[in-house]
């Protein structure tokens, strides 16, 4: 499989895990160090296009799934099927299928939320982790309850709780609202027109939009068991947090407070970057991650 602007050969596979089928992109030497990337909303495996060639050339075996509900992966009906516990088990099952070795892991946005859970509950499966642009769950909850500014930044989380209306608003006029949110929170020219077309193709698959929104609905109805267990939610592998100072969704304070939930954590701020650090500053992010994983 060849994709424009990605030089490395890509293998597109379907794997059974945790009772569903996940579409996964594999790249790099089969005997390389396993490195799994977990995308955020509203992306899919393609959100890691600026990382693939770099980490393949560094000798890693890349495992890049479309997570549950996204793109070519299964989209089970019902909010109950998108609890963080199930999302994490999808990834554990995938790793069990693909490797007997511990893996490195990188997550962005809601993919980073899954990463936080995995490195707290399944530390024996991971060597080191990198979190991009997503606070620890307990920090997020605290700021949603006590910080009016964060409430304003997180307006979309509350909109997404409504039935059917978010689907209508996001999809109408050729995905106008969703595209506008991306364009307004990214510097110009970070995404090309063809990139946006690939995203729209992914969102347009049957059941995708509701499944993607169910990631936000499930925590309200089916909260993680870690919500009520501060010690059990601590990251138990060495963890690097990378944050853009211009992030429109989560502020620097949340990044710094999240370090308290890491047994061995460090934070790198990128002054000129927004929420989409791996797209805007791929060379810096790739170098930071590579040095941390070395």
Give the location of each predicted region.
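A short, glycine- and basic residue-enriched loop/turn
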Residues: 44-45, 113, 273-274
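Conserved HGGG/HGGXW glycine-rich cap/lid loop of the alpha/beta-hydrolase fold
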Residues: 26-74
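Short, flexible hinge/linker loops that cap or flank conserved catalytic cores
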Residues: 16-18, 28-30, 35, 233-235
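Catalytic histidine-centered segment of alpha/beta-hydrolase-like enzymes
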Residues: 273-282, 286
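Residue-level detector of flexible, active-site-proximal loop/helix-junction positions
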Residues: 31, 136, 274
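A short acidic, amphipathic alpha-helical/loop segment
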Residues: 50-51, 254-257, 284
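Flexible "cap/lid" subdomain of the alpha/beta-hydrolase fold that forms the substrate-access gate
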Residues: 1-13, 20-22, 63, 70-106, ...
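C-terminal alpha-helical cap of glycosyltransferases
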Residues: 24, 286-290, 294
């Amino acid at each position: 499989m060849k994709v424009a602007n990605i030089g490395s050969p890509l293998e597109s596979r379907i794997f059974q895990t945790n009772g569903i089928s996940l579409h996964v992109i594999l790249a790099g030497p089969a005997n390389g160090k396993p490195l799994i990337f977990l995308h955020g909303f509203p992306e899919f495996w393609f959100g890691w296009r600026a990382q693939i060639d770099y980490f393949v050339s560094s000798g890693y075996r890349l495992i890049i799934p479309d997570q549950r509900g996204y793109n070519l992966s299964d989209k089970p009906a019902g909010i109950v099927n998108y609890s963080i516990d199930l999302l994490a088990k999808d990834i554990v099952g995938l790793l069990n299928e693909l490797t007997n070795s511990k893996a490195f892991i990188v997550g962005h946005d809601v993919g980073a939320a899954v990463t936080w859970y995995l490195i707290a509950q399944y530390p024996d499966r991971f060597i080191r982790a990198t979190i991009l642009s997503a606070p620890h769950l307990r920090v997020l909850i605290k700021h949603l309850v006590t910080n009016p500014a964060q409430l304003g930044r997180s307006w979309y989380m509350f909109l997404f709780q409504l039935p059917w209306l978010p689907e209508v608003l996001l999809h109408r006029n050729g995905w106008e609202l969703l595209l506008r949110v991306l364009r307004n929170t990214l510097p110009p020219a970070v995404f090309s027109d063809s990139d946006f077309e690939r995203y729209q193709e992914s969102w347009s698959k049957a059941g995708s939009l509701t499944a993607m929104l169910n990631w936000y609905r499930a925590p309200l109805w089916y909260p993680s068991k870690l919500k009520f267990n501060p010690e059990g939610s601590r990251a138990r592998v060495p963890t690097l947090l990378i944050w853009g100072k211009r992030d429109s969704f989560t502020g620097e304070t949340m990044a710094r407070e999240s370090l308290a939930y890491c047994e061995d954590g460090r934070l790198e701020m990128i002054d000129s970057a927004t929420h989409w650090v791996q797209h805007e500053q791929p060379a810096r992010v790739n170098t930071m991650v590579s040095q941390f994983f070395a």
